[in-house]
Amino acid sequence: MLTRKQHELLCFINDRLLQTGVSPSFEEMKEALDLKSKSGVHRLISALEERNFIRRLPNRARALEVLRMPETATAKPTAAASGKAKAAAPAVPQAANENVLEIPLHGRIAAGLPIEALEGQSSLSVPAALLGPGEHYALEVAGDSMVEAGILDGDYALIRRAETARDGEIVVALIADAEATLKYFRREGAMIRLDPANRAYDPQRYKPDQVRIQGKLAGLLRRY
């Protein structure tokens, strides 16, 4: 039973250890969680230690070990976020608990409406373990253009707000300030290419000033 900040810090530490094998610095943790001082990081780490989620390794600087993650962490759909197909997605939770967070649900990805214009329509209950650090929102997927990435019509795409992306990441792209779409992001020379995950659809190419990134896919939920 973690607070949102405790959960964000635990996910940040775990992700950094998986990526680099080295714990993040207190300064990095402070910036990632948008805290005003390192004392806030110390308090969060102490709370995670008391709950046996992490431990500090003795006689080693910047040495933290993640002992366990919240139970719902096993459902994290990292393959979909990295662009690899998945046969199934975690189901939408039906009952609220302390490991479930409410994030804005902006409706279906719709032509003619930038994401900002869809603010505050409703909310979606999401297992906290699916959300790492950062600000998130959800979109209901419309259509079958991403089926080969395991993203089906009616799924809920969990989006981490971002303005930039690396090649191969799945993003919400706003095209010409008019049409929002969920696609693979790639740079191709002086152009931006948005790739579907369905052979029935063709890639679309745009000038960089025609495409604005509004977030990156962080996870997926499915209602059964």
From Swiss-Prot:
GO MF annotations in UniProt: DNA binding; serine-type endopeptidase activity
Enzyme Commission code(s) on record: 3.4.21.88
Annotated InterPro entries: LexA, LexA-like, LexA/Signal_pep-like_sf, LexA_DNA-bd_dom, LexA_repressor, Peptidase_S24_LexA, Peptidase_S24_S26A/B/C, WH-like_DNA-bd_sf
Keywords: Autocatalytic cleavage, DNA damage, DNA repair, DNA replication, DNA-binding, Hydrolase, Repressor, SOS response, Transcription, Transcription regulation
Subunit structure and binding partners: Homodimer.
General function of this protein: Represses a number of genes involved in the response to DNA damage (SOS response), including recA and lexA. In the presence of single-stranded DNA, RecA interacts with LexA causing an autocatalytic cleavage which disrupts the DNA-binding part of LexA, leading to derepression of the SOS regulon and eventually DNA repair.
Name of the protein: LexA repressor
Source species of the chain: Rhizorhabdus wittichii (strain DSM 6014 / CCUG 31198 / JCM 15750 / NBRC 105917 / EY 4224 / RW1)
Origin organism lineage: Bacteria, Pseudomonadati, Pseudomonadota, Alphaproteobacteria, Sphingomonadales
